[in-house]
A protein has these predicted regions:
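Catalytic loop of short-chain dehydrogenase/reductase
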Residues: 107-108, 157-183, 188-197, 209-210
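Short, small/polar-rich loop/turn modules that mediate ligand/substrate recognition or access, typified
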Residues: 196, 201, 259-261
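Substrate-binding pocket helix/loop in short-chain dehydrogenase/reductase
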Residues: 112-117, 121-126, 228
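Canonical Rossmann dinucleotide-binding motif of NAD(H)/NADP(H)-dependent dehydrogenases/reductases
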Residues: 17-48
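The beta1-alpha1 cofactor-binding region of Rossmann-like NAD(H)/NADP(H)-dependent oxidoreductases
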Residues: 75-86, 122, 242
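A conserved structural motif in NAD(P)-dependent oxidoreductases
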Residues: 232-244
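Short C-terminal tail/terminal secondary-structure segment
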Residues: 7-14, 260-276
Length: 276
């Protein structure tokens, strides 16, 4: 077999069912979270879905059941620490100890008045920070507590945003949201360093503008769509949630077993392209 063919064959074999036998918790049940849960299930994982929206949980659970048995969805308010711990405990009893966590749950703070710093209110800032920071914190804490059980192992992937690294002052001047997502970047670095000796990895994905329900306002704005075409040239517009799911699959799989404390920016070129 020619060398190139051997490399292709090895790659194809290595990624088939790359989550076989693993239990992966996903926070959120729409958009990126839903795409990821479906992809992980297709790759052989048993999925624990945790989300506030009961209807979305039920819909996603039904979709996952069509891909095979062994999945479970639990409606839970992830801003509530004890409720999150209880949900993870239930998931462990049903599916086993989690091998991975993909923490997606969060949202825009615009409804709380998020915008430029000089217009921000203390209440709006706190609400936006809680909406994005608490679900990631509570889920990561609950997951890592279970992953520390002997033999310790696991992979935790948080979702941040390109806005934490490459701002868009004209169209997305949402400073509380950027600060909250910046916190995810810092948490990943600190936690990765602390838990590496235990074999538990922490990484972060920073997506660009993705076509999700959270981005519905942006998707309906011709100015934003034109901006996205220029700012994300690899995508030619908004990113597909499946692109983020693919990156998460890599970080949760053993293919990335030597990677921790890293920020994987999946932005279609946003952070290296001028479009303002």
């Amino acid at each position: 077999m020619p060398g190139a063919d051997r490399r292709v064959a090895w790659y194809q074999m290595s990624v088939v069912h790359s989550l076989d036998g693993k239990v992966v918790a996903v926070t959120g049940a729409s958009g990126i979270a839903a795409a990821a849960a479906r992809r992980f299930a297709a790759e052989g994982a048993r999925i624990l879905v945790l989300s506030l929206d009961e209807a979305e949980c039920a819909t996603l659970a039904s979709d996952l059941d069509s891909l095979g048995a062994g999945h479970h969805a639990i409606p839970v308010d992830l801003t509530d620490g004890p409720a999150t711990e209880a949900a993870f405990a239930s998931g462990r009893a049903l599916l086993g100890r989690p091998d991975g966590l993909f923490a997606v749950a969060g949202g825009s703070g615009r409804r709380f008045g998020d915008g430029p710093l000089h217009d921000a209110t203390t209440e709006g800032w706190r609400a936006t920070m809680d909406l994005n920071g608490l679900p990631a914190f509570h889920a990561a804490r609950a997951a890592v507590r279970l992953m520390l059980e002997e033999p310790a192992r696991g992979s935790i992937v948080l979702v941040a945003s390109v806005l934490a690294q490459a701002p868009s002052p004209r169209l997305f001047p949402t400073h509380a949201y950027a600060a909250a997502k910046g916190g995810a970047l810092s948490l990943v670095k600190a936690a990765a360093s602390f838990y590496a000796p235990s074999g538990i990895r922490f990484n972060c994905i920073a997506p660009g503008l993705v076509d999700t329900p959270m981005a519905a306002r942006a998707a309906a704005d011709p100015d934003v769509i034109d901006f996205a075409r220029r700012k994300q040239p690899l995508a030619g517009g908004m990113l597909d949630p499946a692109e983020i799911a693919a990156a998460a699959l890599f970080l949760l799989s053993d293919e990335s077993r030597m990677i921790t404390g890293q920020i994987l920016t999946v932005d279609g070129g946003w952070s290296v392209t001028e479009a303002e």
